[in-house]
C-alpha cells in the first residue's frame, strides 16, 4: 500500500477537542502562531461551544473570525474518518485516551494522516502500536503520542544531551524533574484511569513486546530503580512510574546515535528527604485508592474535566529537568526548563509538534514514532524559539 498523498486535502491541521481546558489553550497558541496561509480548523462535539471559542480567539486574532468549525464525536467513528480524510495533521486533546482515543488513531492510520496527542497512558499507546502500527506504516501516517509535558522535555532533552556526548560509546543518562505546577480535571481523570488498570497495562506491554522489533547489536534499558541521592543536582531522586522513560527508550532503540549500550533512569528531584518519602507514600496511596471504583469516583470528583489552574496560578508555575549524563569519558549536566508545564507549555509543545509535522522538512518516518524520532532537531529549534530553554548547566 503506497504512502497516501495528503497535499490536496482541505486542511493542513485540525485541532480536535478544542473546547476542553488544554484544547482551548492549544487553540489560542495556534491562533497566534500558525504561519500565513495555514489552513486549519477547530473540531469537537458541540458546535455552540466551538463558536464561543472562535469568538474568543477572534478578539485577539481577527483572522480567526472565519475559522472553520467541524463537528465530530469519538462515539461516531464515521465522523472521525471524515475528519481524518480532510486534513494532513490531526491534533487531539480528548482523553482519557483509553476511553475516547482509538477510533481517531484508527482513522488517521487508515487515511495516511499524521496524528498528534497528549497521551501519557502507557496501556493506550501499547495497544495502538499492536493494532494500528502496520496500517500506519503502510499508509505513511506518523502516529506521535505523548507530545506535551509527557514526554517532550525528556525525549528531546535526552536527544539533545546525547548529541553532546562522543559517538559509538555506552551512554548513561539520569533525568531529574522539578516543578511547582497544578493540574486539571482532565489530567486527573486520565491518571486515575491508568492507575486503576495495572494488570491490563502489563498485559498490553507484553503484547507489544511480542511483536515490536528490538534493536540489533545494541542494548537499550530504562530500569525502574530505587531512590538515589544526586550530588550533581543536589536532590533526592524519587523514581517516577510515568510513561516518559519508555518514550526515551523507544527513541534510543530507533536511533543509533544513542550508542551501543544506552541506559536512562527517570526521577522526581526533591530537595529534602522527608518530602521525597512523603511524596512516594502519597503517590502509592492514590494508586491504591484508584483500584476501588467508589474511591476513584470520589478522587475524580475533586476536579471536573474542563477545570484547571487559573491564569495567575499558571503564570507562577515552572519546570526544570536536569540530565546527568556520561559517555566515553565525558560527563555533563544539561537542562530543559520553561513555564507552566501542564498547560501553557504543554499547549505550546503540542501545537509546535503539529506545526512541525505539517511544515518542516523532516526525516522519512511512518507508524508509531516519538517526537525525537519524527521531528528531532526541528522541534527542538521550534521550542527554543518559543521560549523553552535547552542548555548545558555550568556547575
Q: Where is each model-derived feature located?
A:
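Structural motif
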Residues: 12, 88-89, 114, 332
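C-terminal catalytic/substrate-binding lobe primarily of soluble NAD(P)-dependent oxidoreductases
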Residues: 2-6, 163-395
Amino acid at each position: 500500500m503506497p504512502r497516501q498523498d495528503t497535499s490536496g486535502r482541505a486542511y493542513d491541521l485540525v485541532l480536535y477537542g478544542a473546547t476542553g481546558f488544554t484544547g482551548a489553550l492549544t487553540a489560542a497558541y495556534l491562533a497566534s502562531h500558525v504561519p500565513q496561509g495555514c489552513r486549519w480548523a477547530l473540531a469537537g462535539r458541540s458546535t455552540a461551544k466551538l463558536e464561543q471559542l472562535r469568538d474568543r480567539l477572534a478578539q485577539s486574532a481577527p483572522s480567526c473570525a472565519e475559522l472553520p468549525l467541524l463537528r465530530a464525536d469519538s462515539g461516531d467513528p464515521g465522523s472521525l474518518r471524515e475528519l481524518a480524510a480532510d486534513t494532513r495533521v490531526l491534533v487531539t486533546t480528548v482523553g482519557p485516551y483509553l476511553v475516547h482515543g482509538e477510533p481517531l488513531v484508527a482513522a488517521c492510520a487508515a487515511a495516511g494522516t499524521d496524528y498528534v496527542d497528549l497521551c501519557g497512558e502507557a496501556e493506550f499507546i501499547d495497544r495502538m502500536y499492536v493494532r494500528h502500527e502496520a496500517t500506519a506504516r503502510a499508509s505513511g501516517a506518523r502516529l506521535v503520542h505523548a507530545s506535551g509535558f509527557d514526554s517532550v522535555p525528556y525525549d528531546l532533552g535526552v536527544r539533545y544531551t546525547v548529541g553532546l556526548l562522543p559517538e559509538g560509546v555506552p551512554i548513561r543518562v539520569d533525568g531529574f524533574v522539578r516543578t511547582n505546577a497544578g493540574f486539571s480535571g482532565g489530567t486527573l481523570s486520565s491518571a486515575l484511569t491508568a492507575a486503576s488498570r495495572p494488570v491490563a497495562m502489563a498485559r498490553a506491554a507484553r503484547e507489544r513486546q511480542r511483536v515490536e522489533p528490538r534493536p540489533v547489536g545494541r542494548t537499550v534499558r530504562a530500569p525502574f530503580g530505587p531512590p538515589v541521592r544526586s550530588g550533581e543536582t543536589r536532590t533526592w531522586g524519587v523514581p517516577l512510574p510515568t510513561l516518559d522513560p519508555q518514550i526515551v527508550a523507544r527513541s534510543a532503540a530507533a536511533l543509533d546515535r544513542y550508542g551501543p549500550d544506552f541506559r536512562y533512569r527517570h526521577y522526581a528531584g526533591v530537595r529534602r528527604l522527608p518530602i521525597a518519602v512523603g511524596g512516594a507514600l502519597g503517590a502509592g496511596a492514590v494508586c491504591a485508592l484508584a483500584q476501588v471504583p467508589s474511591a476513584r469516583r470520589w478522587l475524580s470528583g475533586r476536579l471536573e474535566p474542563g477545570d484547571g489552574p487559573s491564569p495567575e496560578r499558571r503564570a507562577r508555575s515552572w519546570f526544570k529537568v536536569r540530565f546527568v549524563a556520561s559517555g566515553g569519558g565525558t560527563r555533563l549536566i544539561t537542562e530543559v526548563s520553561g513555564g507552566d508545564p501542564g498547560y501553557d507549555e504543554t499547549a505550546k509543545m503540542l501545537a509546535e509538534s503539529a506545526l512541525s509535522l505539517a511544515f518542516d522538512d523532516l526525516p522519512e518516518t511512518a507508524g508509531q514514532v516519538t517526537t525525537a524520532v519524527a521531528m528531532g532537531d526541528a522541534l527542538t529549534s521550534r521550542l527554543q524559539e518559543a521560549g523553552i530553554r535547552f542548555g548545558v548547566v555550568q556547575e
